[in-house]
Amino acid sequence: KQISALLLQHINLTFLSVVAAVIIGVPIGILISHFKKANKTVLGIANTIQAIPSMALLGFLIPFLGIGVVPSVFMVVLYSLLPIIKNTFTSIEGINPQMIEAAEGIGLTKLQILFKIQIPMALPIIMAGIRISAVTAVGLMTIAAFVGAGGLGFLVFSGIRTANTNQILAGAIPACILALFIDWTAAIIEKIVVPKGISGNIGKNKVTFLQKLVLLVCFALFTFGIGKTIFERYIATPEKTVTVASKDYTEQIILGNMLAELIENNTDIKVNRKFALGGTKVIFG
């Protein structure tokens, strides 16, 4: 039951991060392909962010974004941008200039050239970048447990702390399977969005009913998870809540649970448990 709940958290956090990275990264890649002077600066910034250790970046974000979901998603989005921006820029730059010239010759506007020629031709390489980002995001999101955002990383960190190999595997194996599943899902989406003439596999480019059903279920789960989060945070009647947090020490986790039980049993206050956090800075964040 715990693994299922943490897996669902991990899926929602990962999908949210990847969708946000695509919404941000693809337009940036398109823009820098048209504004040549900006491409070195933008790619340089993206490369620099990629070089920063993930734990250090997450720790840096805590004073500004607090703990929980927001800094975790923000961090993964930043790390996911480089493959998307770079692949988008490279794919558009790689289009034959004679094709663009021919499009201009028949009277197409710049926007028409972008949406009818450049983006369709660039889609295979753009989707390759998105698939890389999606798989990377699954691994990076395990660090979300460090700041109390949940996910499969909770099992991994708990297992490391208690030298429990089975618990580590209980978090690591579902994460690996999830990464493969997300890559497979992205491959199906690629079949759908890439024009058949460009993909080069006209006969093999058909999406089966089962694949469509899996995509529909994934979309429904993602929409439900995001909708539930938005409803609980912004729409539902707010309850009296207090957060009880602890470091990743056994004694502190026991004390944290004792305090949480004491508060809930003697008051009408709901306790938000954030145990086994990464350190003092995280707790006071």
Each language-model region and where it sits:
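Short helix-initiation/N-cap motifs at beta->coil->alpha
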Residues: 272-284
